[in-house]
Curated annotation (Swiss-Prot):
GO terms for cellular component: ribonucleoprotein complex; ribosome. Keywords: Ribonucleoprotein, Ribosomal protein, RNA-binding, rRNA-binding, tRNA-binding. It comes from Chlamydia pneumoniae (Chlamydophila pneumoniae). NCBIfam families: PRK00010.1. This is Large ribosomal subunit protein uL5. It holds the Pfam family Ribosomal_L5. The gene is rplE. Part of the 50S ribosomal subunit; part of the 5S rRNA/L5/L18/L25 subcomplex. Contacts the 5S rRNA and the P site tRNA. Forms a bridge to the 30S subunit in the 70S ribosome.
Amino acid sequence: MSRLKKFYTEEIRKSLFEKFGYANKMQIPVLKKIVLSMGLAEAAKDKNLFQAHLEELTMISGQKPLVTKARNSIAGFKLREGQGIGAKVTLRGIRMYDFMDRFCNIVSPRIRDFRGFSNKGDGRGCYSVGLDDQQIFPEINLDRVKRTQGLNITWVTTAQTDDECTTLLELMGLRFKKAQ
């Protein structure tokens, strides 16, 4: 069992149950999945660069990414139907908890001028963060990076409100800005 999963079942569930006063234990929020995505429209013109970014996403997540393709052609953007324009990975289970542990303890402290993430969610129990640079991940070999590329991370939970979601993620180790 992952260190974070064990901590969730033994400690976090109890503190969430006490803080929010749920009627039963099935109402306690759970982290369902983590989705990592990259928009690679500029890299789509250069196949070697596109493959390099796919390899980086594979190293970051530990899974092979799904290439997202254009649904229709747009001549103004020189985009053809079926052309690869991005990549995404969905993490569940043990890989999800391992990624969350690495992100909170290793990656987020490496972000330059980091003072915490915004505590605004989507209102339905999901929380998203956009990173400007993939080089903050220790799995990435800095000598092989051809171009810096952003990365979007979305945490999907069973929480009903932003407060429940941010409290769950904060107890798991994600750092948020302090309310002033």
